[in-house]
Amino acid sequence: MPKLKTRKAAAKRFKATGTGKFLRRRAFRNHLLDHKTPKQKRHLATKAVVDRTDEERVTLMMPYA
């Protein structure tokens, strides 16, 4: 059986943890930041865990993660 290919777009966006979960960036932190409070921006700078409903899709895109 041939090797499975990793989806490079997913590899750039997600990072696997040691426990098998995936981390992702938060949305709403690219532009239009003037009206957001520093607390909001600090919170948006942190990583979030991919929801379990999306976990299977990410796993299929990154078979060796």
Swiss-Prot record:
Keywords for the protein's UniProt record, in alphabetical order: Ribonucleoprotein, Ribosomal protein
**Which is an annotated GO molecular function term of this record?**
structural constituent of ribosome
A Pfam family this chain is assigned to: Ribosomal_L35p
GO biological process entries: translation
What Gene3D superfamilies does the database record attribute to this sequence? 4.10.410.60
Q: Which HAMAP family match?
A: Ribosomal_bL35 (MF_00514)
What family name appears in the similarity comment? Belongs to the bacterial ribosomal protein bL35 family.
- PANTHER family linked: 54S RIBOSOMAL PROTEIN BL35M, LARGE RIBOSOMAL SUBUNIT PROTEIN BL35M
Q: Could you identify this protein by its name?
A: Large ribosomal subunit protein bL35
* Organism expressing this protein natively: Synechococcus sp. (strain CC9605)
